[in-house]
Amino acid sequence: MSLLIRGATVVTHEESYRADVLCANGLIQAIGENLETPSGCDVLDGGGQYLMPGGIDPHTHMQLPFMGTVASEDFFSGTAAGLAGGTTSIIDFVIPNPRQSLLEAFHTWRGWAQKSAADYGFHVAITWWSDEVAREMGELVAQHGVNSFKHFMAYKNAIMAADDTLVASFERCLELGAVPTVHAENGELVFHLQQKLLAQGLTGPEAHPLSRPPQVEGEAASRAIRIAETLGTPLYLVHISSREALDEIAYARAKGQPVYGEVLAGHLLLDDSVYRHPDWATAAGYVMSPPFRPVEHQEALWRGLQSGNLHTTATDHCCFCAEQKAMGRDDFSKIPNGTAGIEDRMALLWDAGVNSGRLSMHEFVALTSTNTAKIFNLFPRKGAIRVGADADLVLWDPQGSRTLSAATHHQRVDFNIFEGRTVRGIPSHTISQGKLLWAAGDLRAEPGAGRYVERPAYPSVYEVLGRRAERQRPVAVER
């Protein structure tokens, strides 16, 4: 099966040019002007549109067991919704229970993901520590293509990683050539503030952001960055939502530390007023962690993208329907944390970023695809338009528009946190493994078509770290 995209403007993270692109056997086979059409090849007219690398969402949680329930989106429905939005690959999370084998949890998630409609990989969370955890980390890297490990600094009495676990796991990541990632919130402070607010009679969603103020995120970001700096590891911080956390990243990067920041579309576009909505269910629908912040943090995050201190855009796609959110009707701390966004991420970033002049098209490609591929060692297989790369592409109509709504989205959740927002600039066609799976409103996703993608250890940042460590190696004093 082959597909020729004719006459589009190819846009990568570095350049743009007019060309035809031929896809066959799941790969990009040729790029050039006026390519011949092979016998039996389908032809897609790309005139007037941009052809870009398919989106990579580095942060999703499909069918996650969490807070007494299970996320409503499974791996097929979630990746299918992603294809409708231009996202062709995800990196989800394996989250073992404390004391559970990492390998056992990994195989459980692999089983769930077999129905995926798009390519996928996994970060693996470190929720406890032992010699066995260290051994299994090595096996995951060497035999299963895992090159990143997640650490939750929040969720006390559940999956929170204390400092001793952070130190041990970061050190093990360094030995393995893996990237440690963190959810940066001070779990002790969050727990304390939750109990304090509940004792004061604040039980509704409006208390959620009060229990997780920006300082809580800033402190945890600073602590994780200092641990990484001391040990000499890279660090990737997920869903940065506050100016305080961003300032910590900027300060570290100004000193040359390899720290990377991720931001969600929601944190760029929504503010904390949503938690004060008079309808409880509407307000509860926005409960996620970190919470949406006051408006001034949004502008700081946009500046973080523009300055290169934030590197990827994600969704933290973790859907809970209204009935599930109601589990916390009398206690905000029991509202399942999570929102949707995999279908809307790219259109939102284009509309609010490119159309507004905040971002160039090339920055858009970097932030939605290429940077993630580089950080997690998928480039140039993904995140690129070049011969030999995976034929994961999105044909983008800069003049097309749609209104975001639960009534029309493909995400398996009964509300949309961006309800009623109209975006200009949308995917007209999405191509995964050279197959046209989203075509002008027609979703052709196939259960099980997605592949597990192994990510090799030692992404490019380790080249610099290795030389730096050698230069700074301590030398004993001879006496």
From Swiss-Prot:
Residue pairs linked by disulfide bridges in the UniProt entry: none
The record lists Zn(2+) 2 as bound by 150, 183, 239
Q: Superkingdom, according to UniProt?
A: Bacteria
- CC per GO annotation: cytosol
Cite the cofactor comment: Binds 2 Zn(2+) ions per subunit.
Question: Which residues take part in binding substrate?
Answer: 155, 289, 337
User: One Pfam match, by short name?
Assistant: Amidohydro_1
Kindly list any coiled-coil regions of this protein: none
Which top EC class is named for this enzyme in its record? hydrolase
Question: Which residues are modified to N6-carboxylysine?
Answer: 150
Q: Which GO terms describe its molecular function?
A: dihydropyrimidinase activity; hydrolase activity, acting on carbon-nitrogen (but not peptide) bonds, in cyclic amides; metal ion binding
Classification via InterPro entries: Amidohydro-rel, Hydantoinase/dihydroPyrase, Metal-dep_hydrolase_composite, Metal_Hydrolase, Metallo-dep_Hydrolases_sf
Cofactor(s) needed for function: Zn(2+)
Processing and modification events after translation: Carboxylation allows a single lysine to coordinate two zinc ions.
Keyword annotations of the record? Hydrolase, Metal-binding, Zinc
Known catalytic reactions: 5,6-dihydrouracil + H2O = 3-(carbamoylamino)propanoate + H(+)
The record describes its quaternary structure and partners as: Homotetramer.
Its function? Answer: Catalyzes the hydrolysis of dihydropyrimidines and of the structurally related DL-5-mono-substituted hydantoins, to produce N-carbamoyl-D-amino acids.
* Stored NCBIfam families: D-hydantoinase
Give the record's family classification: Belongs to the metallo-dependent hydrolases superfamily. Hydantoinase/dihydropyrimidinase family.
Name this protein carries in UniProt: D-hydantoinase/dihydropyrimidinase
Task: Give the gene that encodes this protein.
Answer: dht
